[in-house]
Amino acid sequence: MGQGLLQIGLTLCIVIAITPVLGRYIARVFLGERTILDRVMNPIERSVYVISGVRPKDEMTGWQYIRAILYTNLFMGILVYSLIYFQRLLPWNPNGLGVPSWDIVLHTVISFVTNTDQQHYAGETTLSYFSQVAALGFLMFTSAATGLAVGIAFIRGLTGRKLGNFYVDLTRGITRILLPISVIGAIALVLLGVPQTIGETLTITTLEGGTQYIARGPVASFEMIKMLGENGGGFFAANSAHPFENPNGLTNLIETIAMIAIPAAMIYTYGVFAKNIKQAWLLFWMVFIVFVILVWVAAGGELQGNPLVNGTLGIEQPNLEGKEVRFGWAETALWAVMTTATMCGAVNGMHDSLMPQGLFATLFNLFLQIIWGGQGTGTAYLFIYLILTVFLTGLMVGRTPEIFGRKIEKREIVLASLILLIHPIVVLIPSAIALAYPFSLSGISNPSFHGISQVVYEYASASANNGSGLEGLTDNSLWWNLSTSLSILTGRYVPIIAMLLLADSMSRKQTVPQTPGTLKTDSLIFTTVTAGIVLILGVLTFFPVLALGPIAEGFKLASGS
């Protein structure tokens, strides 16, 4: 127990230490200030702009920024679909893999272009090295940079700046942040035992005389951007539970830190943009405290173990089902909460084997989307709740709602409400349909309370652009591929459109002078109220589902049945 808690504590301390450093660096990149990589990256970026015809000094309006995102993502999606469809004709296919079915290719492309990386296939038996690295690896960089650009544009709008240029933000996000850190991280992973090869699957003879096939590939480079970009899609079916993706405790620590580094730093980045570091730290600690509570809930459940198993065997041991022994209950519980909090979706153990407490914590993260949140967009979601808090507290005390010196009016509240309503709509309605018809129910491996969790988790993960799943669900079917694709697209692009329109609206407003009656948003009281509103809205929206799923399952286990 002590060792497990020490591992969790060490990881959290590292997160706190790197947040201001990386947050300040990200701010310098997108504020156009000098950075250590200027000498190397400036010529590369200028070449990219010249070749693509981008004028980096041109500012975009909200709709121009939105159209740039949609057109770019559509083009990249069509390109990658074509690459996967013709993978049998392309190089780096030593195992001679053919073409997957059209629906799995469509789901995969939609999933990766939106930074969701939900996988209904096994990478080592479905996709060639070229499809994994050149096609999906390309999307891992661009989808992460797209989310990062949205988050930065949203922060610019809230702080009274123009939104910027999407193509410039996309390029700088890759060249100055994602690519350099990924290169360093990939080298570290190679040194720690993660393979990086284009050799074919090995065929070996075991000690018993049998034949075993060992899949391998260019894993290290794929793995690092998978974690850093909050992508989460694994090179192998077992994801980061596979010893070739995550062989030991040190690689596990590196990947865990990479997973949370940018979402945590983005809160500090806002503080630099707004010139209000105090508020950034208040918001950071608000998110951090809720995160630690959820880790405590999940870790406590795993440490307690399964009461039915322990009672039958007459022992007291943690729940080790679905876990890698090299990580144990503590690192698996921390990872499970972190991967759903950051919308990464990678796993180092099977979430379907989590105790009800752990399942509650992971679902709660998927429902809220702000306990760190996704790449860039999570920060935007956090400030949506901040805007609603200002509006509600202003109504209660009779003050005109203002935030960052700008009035909050009907348009902003309508857009904020739309952003928060889309997620439950594209989670709960498809879940109800899936639970109502036999053709979708056939994929559920557990007909009880856990079966409800399997279905809701699948759609919550899709809509939140997380990508993890309770793998007791047989999800590689036409229904699940198409229905989750719809949830992914709606949950990704509708909020992004609304966020950018809201930011554009705020950027055009005149600054209102502060008065003694102005509500201060950088106070402990206001931050506490914000946390309360976040939790209340999350509980009110999804509590019936939580009650029918992990809460009911927990009571059933506690009763000994």
Curated annotation (Swiss-Prot):
Gene Ontology CC entries for this record: plasma membrane
Listed GO MF terms: P-type potassium transmembrane transporter activity; potassium ion binding
Topology of the protein relative to the lipid bilayer: Multi-pass membrane protein
Subcellular localization, as worded in the UniProt entry: Cell inner membrane
Cystine connections: none
Superkingdom per UniProt: Bacteria
Keywords, ordered alphabetically: Cell inner membrane, Cell membrane, Ion transport, Membrane, Potassium, Potassium transport, Transmembrane, Transmembrane helix, Transport
InterPro entries per UniProt: KdpA
Pfam families assigned to the protein according to its UniProt record, in alphabetical order: KdpA (PF03814)
Residues passing through the membrane, by range: 2-22, 66-86, 135-155, 177-197, 253-273, 280-300, 327-347, 354-374, 378-398, 413-433, 482-502, 531-551
NCBIfam families, sorted: kdpA
Purpose of the protein: Part of the high-affinity ATP-driven potassium transport (or Kdp) system, which catalyzes the hydrolysis of ATP coupled with the electrogenic transport of potassium into the cytoplasm. This subunit binds the periplasmic potassium ions and delivers the ions to the membrane domain of KdpB through an intramembrane tunnel.
Protein family: Belongs to the KdpA family.
Quaternary data: The system is composed of three essential subunits: KdpA, KdpB and KdpC.
Record's protein name: Potassium-transporting ATPase potassium-binding subunit
Source taxonomy: Bacteria, Bacillati, Cyanobacteriota, Cyanophyceae, Nostocales
